[in-house]
Each structure stands twice: as C-alpha cells, then as structure tokens.
From Swiss-Prot:
In late gastrula embryos, expressed in the presumptive first pair of somites and the middorsal wall of the primitive gut. Expression is then up-regulated in the lateral wall of the somites and the notochord. At the late neurula stage, also expressed in the anterior wall of the primitive gut and in the evaginating lateral diverticula. In the earliest larval stage, expression is restricted to both ends of the body. In 36 hour larvae, only faint expression is detected in the notochordal and paraxial mesoderm of the caudal region. Residues 95-146 form the bHLH domain. Its main location: nucleus. Keywords: Developmental protein, Differentiation, DNA-binding, Nucleus, Transcription, Transcription regulation. PROSITE patterns: BHLH. SUPFAM superfamilies: HLH, helix-loop-helix DNA-binding domain (SSF47459). Pfam families: HLH. Residues 66-77 have a biased composition (Gly residues). The lineage of its organism: Eukaryota, Metazoa, Chordata, Cephalochordata, Leptocardii. Efficient DNA binding requires dimerization with another bHLH protein. Homodimer. This is Twist-related protein. Residues 1-92 are annotated as: Disordered. One of its GO terms (cellular component) is nucleus. One of its GO terms (biological process) is negative regulation of cell differentiation.
Length: 196
C-alpha cells in the first residue's frame, strides 16, 4: 500500500513536459535508477514508470504522426508553395523591372524629342552644342527677350505689318545679336569671338 502511494506521488510530480519530452542524453532506465533506494526496492514502480513513459512516448508519437503526418505533407506542400511563390515573386520582380525599363526608355525618348523641338524654336548659333540645362536657360532668355520686344511700341507696329516668318527671322537675328552683346558684356574669355 505504501509502495502504491509512493508510486502515485512520484507520477504526479512529473510534469507533462517531462513525460512527453524526455532528455535525449538519458534513457528512462537511467533516470529511474538514479531516483534513489526506493526504486531498487520496488520493481513494480519501475515498470509502472516505464509504462507511463512508453505510453506518453507512444501517444506523443501517435499525436505527432496524426498531426505531424499532416504537417509533413503540409510541409512538403508548404515547401512547394514557398518554391512556387518564390519563383512567382522572382518572375514578378523581373516583369516589374522590364516594365520600369520600358517606361524609362519612353520617358527619355519623349524628353529628348521635346528638347529637340525646343532647340528648333529657339534661335541658336551654328556653333551651339547645347546641353539640356543650357537649352532651358536659353529658352528662358529667349522668352524674356520676346517679352521685352512685345513691350516696345515700335516693334509692335513693325511686326504687325510683316509676315510671321519674316518676323521670326528678325526676332531670331535680334536675339542672336543680344546674345553676343550679353556674351561680350559679361567679359567673355579670349576665345569668345571665335566661338561666334
């Protein structure tokens, strides 16, 4: 009777984790043999403990088999899903890069076309090889020049009587002259006159 009580209390003191997850380095017999002199005296207690351990191991393995089997199958399908999702994400990334490159090419092409049409409108010198920023600065200067021309009363009457092509040529010539005056007025380098 006393042995039964000892066995009951011993089994109660083990936590669920101790029963389900045994120490991988120690065997159940080694744990049982190290429990003291009472374990040597009562072989039925050791058998009950081993049964309990075996039951907990088998139930844990059957639980793992039932849920783990699904998780292994699910793990494989999960791995396949991860592989396919990685492949799909890589393909999506490649497609996004290709589309971004196409959009950038189209944007650059339209920008270059706009600058070339702007260079045709702005009166330039034959020796001019303007960058984009220089083209924009020259366009701003030309707009200011046109504004000044429109403000003067003399040119308004002259431009109104002439055709638009001739007016454009006169404005272009006047703008070129003003550019040269500005160039020389700002203290151009010694190679400046050769530039024009």
């Amino acid at each position: 009777m006393a042995a039964d009580v000892v066995t009951y209390t011993t089994l109660e003191t083990f936590s669920h984790e101790d029963l389900v997850k045994p120490d991988p380095d120690a065997s159940p017999l080694a744990d049982h043999s190290s429990s003291g002199p009472e374990a040597e005296e009562d072989p039925s207690r050791s058998k009950r403990y081993e049964r309990k351990r075996r039951y907990s191991k088998s139930s844990a393995s059957s639980d793992d088999g039932s849920t783990g089997g699904g998780s292994v199958g699910g793990g494989k399908s999960g791995k396949n899903r991860k592989k396919t999702s990685k492949a799909e994400s890589f393909e999506d990334l490649q497609n996004q890069r290709v589309l971004a490159n196409v959009r950038e090419r189209q944007r650059t092409q339209s920008l270059n076309e706009a600058f070339s049409s702007l260079r045709k409108i702005i009166p330039t010198l034959p020796s001019d090889k303007l960058s984009k920023i220089q083209t924009l600065k020259l366009a701003a200067r030309y707009i200011d020049f046109l504004y000044q021309v429109l403000r003067s009363d003399d040119t308004d009457t002259k431009m109104a009587s002439s055709c638009s092509y001739v007016a454009h040529e006169r404005l272009s010539y006047a703008f070129s002259v003003s550019r040269q005056e500005l160039y020389f007025g700002l203290g151009a380098p010694s190679s400046g006159p050769n530039h024009f």
